[in-house]
Each structure stands twice: as C-alpha cells, then as structure tokens.
C-alpha cells in the first residue's frame, strides 16, 4: 500500500473527519498510519478507528477474513490494531521455560503470493492434545495445510529449457505469510520469512520445494514453512525440456533441529510460543537479514555435520585400535603359555 506525506496536525483538523478517513488514511500503510497517530490528538482518534485497521489487515492478509480468525481478533486488547502490530513486523524468538505448558488451540492463517498476486489462502486450526502423554506432543511436529490428494491450480507455468533459471525466478517471485494466532493469550506472529530463503528440487518427488524459514539460533532450530510446486499431473514430474502447468502440491509447517529432523510436538510448540512472545522489528532490511540468517544457519549445519563425522570417525578408529590390541594381547597370552 502506498504511503503519503502527512499534513500538519493543526491544518488537517480543518478537514472533515470523513474526508480524512476515506481519502487520506486509507492510502497509508500500517507503519505510516501508526506514526501519523502520534502527530496530534485529533489524528490519534481518527487513526485508531477499528474499521480502518480491519480493512488494512484484511487487505494485507486476505485469509484472516475468516469467522474463526475474526472471533479470535475480537478478543485482542485493541482488536485489529493489536493484531496488526503483532503480525506485521518480524519477530525474534524469546526463550521459553520448558516447565510452561505449550500453547493450545493455535490458528494458522496462510496467504501465498506469486509476483504480487495471491494464489492461495487458508485458515486452519491446530488440533493439539493437552497433557504430557498426548500423541501430538510426543510425535514429530508438522502442520499440513493441504490434504494429501489436494493441489492448488495456479497460473504458473514452467516454459521448459533452463530449469535452474526457473527455480531462481520462483524463489524471487513467491511470497508467503504464515500468521500464527493464539486466541487464549491474545497474541499473533508472522512466522514466515515472507520472501523465500531457498528453492531446490526434491529428488524423491521431483517437486520444487520453496522454503520460508525463521531461524531460532538460541535453540539451534529452524521454523520452516515449505511450499511444494509440481506438475499439474500428480503422477508426473515436470518435464525439464517441454515444461508445463504448475500446481501447488503441499504447504506445510515444521520445526527442524540442526540435524534436519522434525522436532517433537511439545518442543516445537515451545519454540513457536517463543516467537509469539518475541520482540518485534520493522526494519526495512528484515527480509534480507532473514535470508542471511538462514544461510548462516545452513553453514552451521554443515559444520556441525562435519564435526559429528570427525567424532564418529575418531570413535571408530579408537574402537578398531582397542579391538586389535585385545586381539594381539589374546594371541600373545595363548602363544606364550
């Protein structure tokens, strides 16, 4: 949404409030609207209108125009204004004590874009079980937005030819908002990196997997929202020479440890709670920094894997030396009797 220069608070008070709200304030984006409210008490009253923030929020995230989300936002301290203040900035993880019960009843609001146009929206409630023995808490954490046999038709086409160039274009053209809402604690957070941090082919399925990740360095973990795109025919891979129509095959959320394994439900929910409670940042370069953090995390994963392989190799060598020494000692004992 475009921004406009804000008129001086004294001069703008001469304009009718309806003109200001319908012709001026509706042209502002969220951060500009919030800063405009601080210029005068008159503008503060106009800028805090619930309908204004509701329309701005729905324009930004179409998926939230869902009865379940509307009901959840209605309980926020300042309604849509509080929701926008939580969801628009990037969030930094705050450490959570494992003694605290993990959040329950979380809602996911997902909006997927291609070259600025929305191609998919959905709201899904996260069914979690209470208690330490619940299967959800002890199983690998994964939230699937699409059903196994479901796919989303898009206007995206792979023209054929240079596959790597198409992969790069897809990485740059796709954008994802994944807003996590906690109706109980009345908090929300956009846990996606917005722009993709990586795109690579899954050699098992042949689909292109595009990742929108938030790295939690303190926990050595990655909150990964993954979008899989493939051929319109489910049984067929994209032909790299001929090309063809592309469908969205999978949209999922998972929390991975440094080994790339999906973490258990309880540990994952604790990390997600840390993002919901985390400090917010609206710096202009946050999308670039999110990708840089991911690339640094990938390097850290490679270093960790190499160190693990060296340790295992050293342990194998020690075991071999010990076994050989015992073998020599045994035969020496037998021969010298």
Swiss-Prot record:
Transmembrane segments: none annotated. Signal peptide: none annotated. Residues 10-58 form the F-box domain. This is F-box protein At2g27310.
């Amino acid at each position: 949404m475009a921004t406009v220069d804000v008129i001086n608070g004294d001069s703008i008070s001469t304009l009718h409030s309806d003109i200001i709200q319908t012709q001026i304030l509706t042209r502002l984006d969220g951060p500009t609207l919030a800063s405009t409210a601080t210029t005068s008490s008159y503008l503060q009253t106009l800028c805090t209108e619930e309908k204004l923030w509701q329309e701005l929020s729905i324009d930004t995230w179409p998926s939230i125009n869902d009865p379940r989300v509307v009901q959840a936002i209605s309980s926020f301290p300042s309604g849509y204004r509080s929701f926008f203040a939580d969801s628009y900035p990037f969030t930094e993880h705050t450490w959570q004590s494992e003694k605290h019960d993990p959040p329950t009843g979380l809602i996911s609001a997902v909006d997927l874009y291609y070259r600025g146009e929305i191609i998919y929206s959905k709201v899904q409630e996260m069914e979690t079980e209470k208690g330490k023995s619940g299967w959800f808490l002890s199983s690998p954490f994964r939230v699937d937005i699409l059903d196994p046999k479901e796919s989303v038709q898009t206007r995206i086409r792979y023209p054929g030819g240079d596959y790597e160039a198409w992969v790069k274009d897809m990485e740059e053209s796709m954008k994802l908002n994944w807003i996590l809402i906690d109706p109980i604690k009345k908090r929300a957070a956009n846990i996606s990196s917005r722009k993709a941090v990586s795109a690579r082919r899954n050699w098992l399925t042949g689909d292109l997997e595009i990742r929108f990740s938030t790295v939690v360095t303190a926990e050595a973990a990655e909150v990964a929202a993954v979008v899989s795109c493939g051929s319109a025919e489910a049984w067929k891979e994209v032909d790299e020479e001929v090309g063809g129509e592309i469908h969205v095959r999978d949209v999922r959320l998972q929390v991975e440890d440094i080994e790339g394994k999906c973490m258990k439900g309880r540990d994952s929910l604790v990390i997600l709670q840390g993002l919901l409670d985390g400090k917010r940042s609206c710096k202009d370069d946050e999308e670039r920094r999110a990708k840089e953090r991911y690339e640094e995390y990938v390097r850290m994963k490679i270093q960790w894997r190499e160190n693990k392989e060296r340790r295992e190799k050293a342990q194998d060598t020690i075991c071999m030396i010990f076994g050989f020494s015992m073998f020599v000692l045994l035969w020496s004992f037998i021969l010298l009797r």
